[in-house]
């Protein structure tokens, strides 16, 4: 049986971890980094880039580069008005669902997230040296049922059996408390990431991690701080030059990168210069953007965002039934907690210095890996008791939401309640399932609807309809309704608002596999072309440097083989390139043997193109698409 990996599928960055014995290990990706940008790009040549490679080309390819896709997971098109304004890529309405359109192809948010998850899966497989099929994936604690189901669907598309969906603050608490199982303390986990904010209050003791309450805001994170800076520098430039830089997608992407960089710098400095040369041009010539941004100005720009942080904190403490003074530690999680103002707010609100002992970028993935270890049986003496973040209920007479399960109820849980008909001789009822805290049904999130029919005609109030809500350990809801008189029952597993069917998910899984094969084929082609390019370069170089040392009868043959390789490089297939390289290498081998014999065994043998590029280089770079040309000098045996 293989390992269960832990994945933090973040708005800005993602991270993967796995249990190695009794300790979790964060896995470095192929670029050597412990986190991977949650960015996807589709190039004009059809290549699909994920992570750092996608981020590097974002400025020149903004409309085909997808970032912050997590903000659209499990949400309807009419629910994302604010988010879609921040995206330079095209977001369309397809049957009420939010979709991304790139190069005339339409992708669901789950499909895009699956591309990121595939990268995480591959990273783990490279590290472990074995196939990975199971994972624990984290979500913001305040994600609703539809968003959780969408995350699970993304995992399935990526070829992963998602064993558990776990809340990010809870995962962080697991990582924080793994070595503190014998202690008893009450902890607040303050998680401010790239796109979401969560606050969870937990009680840790004797290996039990019990969530007392959770609250948050799924529209608040680092992206929002970046946008404040973008608007500020764009407005300042417009005042000076009369040009709105936000109207051009490439320029907007430059502003986004500069804003993110400035925000990060202001965490360690009190001021920073935003310098973007040649940001635009007029008839008068090029224009440059140079603006100094102080930390005080940044804090003033984001004052409303900082204010929004405290309300969820107040609700979480109130719902936990704990006093502020009972909180032993406040653990900071998420990259945005590095902002000094955020740390100051936390200190003032909780009346104590926040705990910075965990890596805010990695701790969530570590916690997910620990949960994977618990499910696998590798981690013992750990019991996790999480809660549902929002109340769940149904619509009843008058459009009222009647709650069956209150927010912050420990999961898994099951609740039953008996309802009746609203009219005489009513033979069917519609069960409208809702999630939220508002008293009226229309103000809450619709999770699903289903009908229970064939109810025997009776006066209103007589039929007994038993409604059962069942939340599993992933926080995903199952609802059933049963006519107690006839025993007839209808049930529904609440699906994501994305409405992805099993057939659609299966098709997306096949597409993902095809892309993986295409990516491998493309990588092989690039590797082969890089080796061929190096062989052409080094052959030409040695032909010139060795001169008449090459036998006169061999030179035309060698030059002919070189021309064949050049032609294959311009117009040929991978197979023709390999064939031409093999032929050229064979010629070089014969020449190298001749030179060695003519110079004698005491002399240094000239380093041939066949040896330097086709031989050793192909071995070294067979698994790396980024082949670099190596320059070298031919050492004549007489010149030392």
From Swiss-Prot:
Residues 595-613 have a biased composition (Polar residues). Keywords: ATP-binding, Chaperone, Nucleotide-binding, Phosphoprotein, Stress response. It comes from Pelodictyon phaeoclathratiforme (strain DSM 5477 / BU-1). CDD domains: ASKHA_NBD_HSP70_DnaK-like (cd10234). Pfam families: HSP70. One of its GO terms (molecular function) is ATP binding. The keyword Cell division does not apply. Residues 487-526, 593-640 are annotated as: Disordered. Acts as a chaperone. Belongs to the heat shock protein 70 family. This is Chaperone protein DnaK. The keyword RNA-binding does not apply. The lineage of its organism: Bacteria, Pseudomonadati, Chlorobiota, Chlorobiia, Chlorobiales. The modification Phosphothreonine is found at residue 196. InterPro entries: ATPase_NBD, Chaperone_DnaK, Heat_shock_70_CS, HSP70_C_sf, HSP70_peptide-bd_sf, Hsp_70_fam. Transmembrane segments: none annotated. Coiled coil: none annotated. Residues 630-640 have a biased composition (Acidic residues). Gene3D superfamilies: 1.20.1270.10, 3.30.420.40, Actin, Chain A, domain 4 (3.90.640.10), Substrate Binding Domain Of DNAk, Chain A, domain 1 (2.60.34.10). It comes from the Bacteria. SUPFAM superfamilies: Actin-like ATPase domain (SSF53067), Heat shock protein 70kD (HSP70), C-terminal subdomain (SSF100934), Heat shock protein 70kD (HSP70), peptide-binding domain (SSF100920). The gene is dnaK. Induction: By stress conditions e.g. heat shock. Residues 501-526 have a biased composition (Basic and acidic residues).
């Amino acid at each position: 049986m293989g390992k269960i990996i832990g994945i933090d599928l973040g708005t800005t960055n993602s991270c993967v971890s796995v249990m190695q014995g009794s300790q979790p290990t964060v896995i470095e990706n192929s670029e050597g980094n412990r986190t991977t940008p949650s960015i996807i790009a589709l190039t004009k040549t059809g290549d699909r880039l994920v992570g750092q490679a996608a981020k590097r080309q974002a400025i020149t390819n903004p409309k085909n580069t997808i970032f912050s896709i997590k903000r659209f997971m499990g949400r309807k098109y009419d629910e994302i008005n604010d988010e879609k304004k921040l995206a330079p890529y095209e977001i369309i309405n397809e049957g009420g669902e939010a979709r991304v359109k790139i190069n005339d192809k339409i992708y669901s948010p789950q499909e895009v997230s699956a591309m990121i998850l595939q990268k995480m899966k591959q990273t783990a497989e490279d590290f472990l040296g074995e196939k990975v099929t199971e994972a624990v994936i984290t979500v913001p604690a305040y994600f609703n049922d539809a968003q959780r189901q969408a995350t699970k669907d993304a995992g399935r598309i990526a070829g992963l059996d998602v064993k558990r969906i776990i809340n990010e603050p809870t995962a962080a608490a697991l990582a924080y408390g793994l070595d503190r199982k014998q202690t008893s303390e009450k902890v607040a986990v303050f998680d401010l990431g790239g796109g979401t904010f969560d606050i969870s209050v937990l009680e840790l003791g004797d290996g039990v991690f019990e969530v007392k309450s959770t609250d948050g805001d799924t529209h608040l994170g680092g992206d929002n701080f970046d946008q404040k800076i973008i608007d500020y520098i764009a407005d300042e430039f417009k005042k000076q030059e009369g040009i709105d830089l936000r109207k051009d997608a490439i320029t907007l992407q430059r502003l986004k990168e500069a804003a993110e960089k400035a925000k990060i710098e202001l965490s360690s400095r009190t001021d920073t210069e935003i310098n973007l040369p040649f940001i635009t041009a007029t008839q008068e010539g090029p224009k440059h953007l140079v603006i100094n941004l102080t930390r005080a100005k940044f804090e003033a720009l984001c004052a409303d965002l900082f204010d929004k942080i405290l309300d969820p904190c107040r609700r979480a403490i109130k719902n936990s039934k704990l006093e502020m003074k009972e909180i032993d530690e406040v653990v900071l999680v998420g990259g945005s907690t590095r902002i000094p103002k955020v740390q100051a707010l936390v200190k003032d609100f909780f009346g104590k210095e926040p705990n910075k002992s965990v890596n805010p970028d990695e701790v969530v993935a570590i916690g997910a890996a620990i949960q994977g270890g618990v499910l696998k049986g590798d981690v013992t003496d750990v019991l996790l008791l999480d809660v549902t973040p929002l109340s769940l209920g149904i619509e009843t007479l008058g459009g009222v939401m009647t709650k069956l399960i209150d927010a912050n109820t420990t999961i898994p849980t099951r609740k039953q309640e008996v309802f009746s008909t609203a009219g005489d001789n009513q033979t069917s009822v519609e069960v409208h399932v809702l999630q939220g805290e508002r008293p009226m049904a229309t103000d809450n999130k619709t999770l699903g609807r289903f009908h229970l029919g064939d109810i025997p005609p009776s006066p209103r109030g007589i039929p007994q309809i038993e409604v059962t809500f069942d939340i599993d350990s992933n926080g995903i809801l199952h609802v059933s309704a049963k006519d107690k008189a006839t025993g007839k029952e209808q049930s529904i597993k609440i699906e994501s608002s994305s409405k992805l069917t099993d057939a659609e998910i299966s098709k997306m899984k096949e597409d993902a596999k095809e892309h993986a094969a295409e990516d491998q084929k493309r990588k092989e082609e690039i590797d082969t072309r890089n080796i061929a390019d190096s062989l052409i370069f080094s052959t030409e170089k040695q032909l010139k440097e060795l001169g008449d040392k090459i036998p006169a009868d061999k030179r035309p043959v060698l030059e002919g083989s070189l021309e064949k390789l050049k032609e294959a490089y311009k117009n040929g297939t991978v197979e023709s390139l390999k064939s031409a390289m093999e032929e050229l290498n064979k010629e070089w081998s014969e020449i190298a043997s001749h030179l060695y014999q003519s110079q004698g065994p005491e002399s240094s043998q000239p380093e041939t193109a066949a040896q330097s590029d086709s031989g050793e280089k192909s071995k070294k770079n067979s698994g790396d698409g980024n082949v670099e040309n190596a320059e070298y000098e031919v050492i004549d045996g007489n010149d030392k």
